Amino acid sequence: MTPDSLLNDDWTRTIERLGGAEALASSARDTQAFAWGRKVRTPIVLLRLVLAYCLGEWGLRSTTAWATAIGLVDISNVALLYRLRRCGDWLALLVGHLLAMKAPTQSHGRLIRILDATSVPKADRAAKRGNGLWRIHSAFDLPSERFGQFVLTDEHESEQLDRIPVVRGEIRLADRVHLQPDRIASVLRDGGDIVVRAGWKNVRWQRQNGEAFDLLDALRNAVDGRIDQPVWIARKHGPALELRLIAIRKSDAAAAESRRKARRQAQKDGYQISQQTLAAADWFILVTSLTAAEFSAADVLGLYRLRWRVELGFKRLKSVIGLHGPPGTDERSARPYILAHLLMLLLLEPSVDALEDSPHWAYAA
């Protein structure tokens, strides 16, 4: 964001996209972001000031100097910080408003929703020593290539498959950290389907009768390097969950690379890698609730390959919008800082494709 973009016609259009001046004033008062107008005269001025600080990377002093120079408002850097800390709920409401305006669309009757998370470091030294993070949990929707949901937490909140509300009929794609049986059951109960990557020892594999299912033995005996069969996974709360196991043997080159990465990770973490892990590295393993009658194994594998699109979504957030670790150590200021970047991403999404050299989803593999 540049100073000009806060002053020209783009700013007027931004206000309109956020519901107009009257709606912004109402939401600012409802969330107590704006209570009086002695210095900062209107919520519109407050929003302009907060976005200039969060997106302009000027710092508090430079932002207030800029605001004074253009005749926007004359306040101290301390006063700006105070107002910023009151804006978290307001900015969250505005992000929600933009998300609601573009409710997910369907693709061939089904919404494809990719779950993932990204993080930015906390600013203070103690947090950095303790790997302190702000974590942004997201749902990235296809074919619209838009973020459909955001949830902001710190490093104490882990990635969870059901953290983002389910849109009935969606197909939820997620990596192996989301192989969480009880949370998978929650998504299915709310009307979604799942395609989740699996590791050989992430869960307790079972047969229909409750006996243990030896996944590695099944991989060893797979015909033509493929598996497509029912499987059950044990749950902590409730009966075992029936899913569909799909596995395909990797190419020699891909398998060798996977084994190399597994050995390197074991060396880094200081443990002896098992032969079972090396054997499983030769395979790409998924579980899904999609039926074979509706989706072939090739269809399911093709769906999962779409996960690379969310990486481009996070690229937009960090390179195009410029999100990095927020300054300061206080959650009350870090939260609005991150929300301001999410707000700007949503405002720019209709035109952001023109800024990138990546192909559109419709032309992707």
PLM region spans:
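Single, function-defining residue in the core of a domain
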Residues: M1-E57, A65, D74-I75, A79-C87, ...
